[in-house]
Amino acid sequence: MDKFEKILTGLKKIEGMAEPLVEERMEEFRRLGSSGSEEELFSELSFCVLTANWSAGGGIRAQKEIGISGFINLSQEELSRRLSELGHRFPHKRAEFIVKNRHLINNLKEIISFSAPDARRLLVREAKGIGWKESSHFLRNIGQLEVAILDRHILKILHEAGCIEDIPSGWTEKKYLSIEERFRELAERFGKPPGETDLYIWYMIKGKVEK
């Protein structure tokens, strides 16, 4: 049996409903990647730091409430307090990561000008709180669609379909790229880039398109 068949059947069922929402979100991503300021890019990087072990919805809410200026200017203590008020599970550590990442402001446009694999490796090395999944999330959210965001929900779907043997408890580059290749096969069958296919899967799971 085709291991992708069950997932593809589900995706085809929701494709028509999800498409206008996905296209709207994709336009936001392309606009941010092509004309976003360093500060806007840093806000998106901070969003990706926040969503790790939390939720996209929570990250969107925090990004809106704290704002670009808050991510750039608030003290670590004040940022931690704000994140705590917003219900983040790890407010102190995430505030620390965001503050430590401020050295990347004025370098992010250069980083995203590299190929996606090179930009991803650089972000994993230089940014606090940014691993393989989070760096892929950031790059997708600025319109680089060839990367896959291997979130636990995506991994669960791949595992249940028999596409992967187990769900990793942590990531090495080799392991991430190996499973990303499986996801890329799924995306190719669906007819969309990996970063776009992810949004359709999230619509299939949640009935909405976040980021």
Language-model segments: what does each one mean?
Residues 54, 89, 189-192:
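Alpha-helical structural elements of signaling/regulatory helical domains
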Residues 1-86:
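Structure-specific DNA junction-binding interface
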Residues 63-128:
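Alpha-helical ds-nucleic-acid-binding substructure associated with the helix-hairpin-helix region
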Residues 50-58, 70-71, 106, 146, ...:
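Short alpha-helix boundary/capping elements
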Residues 49, 83, 87, 142, ...:
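Short amphipathic alpha-helical interaction patches enriched in hydrophobic/aromatic residues
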Residues 38, 42, 55, 94, ...:
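Hydrophobic (often cysteine-bearing) scaffold residues that line and stabilize catalytic clefts
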Residues 57-61, 74, 78, 93, ...:
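Alpha-helix N-cap and coil->helix boundary residues
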Residues 1-31, 95-98, 102, 113-124, ...:
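C-terminal accessory module of base-excision DNA glycosylases/AP lyases that mediates lesion recognition
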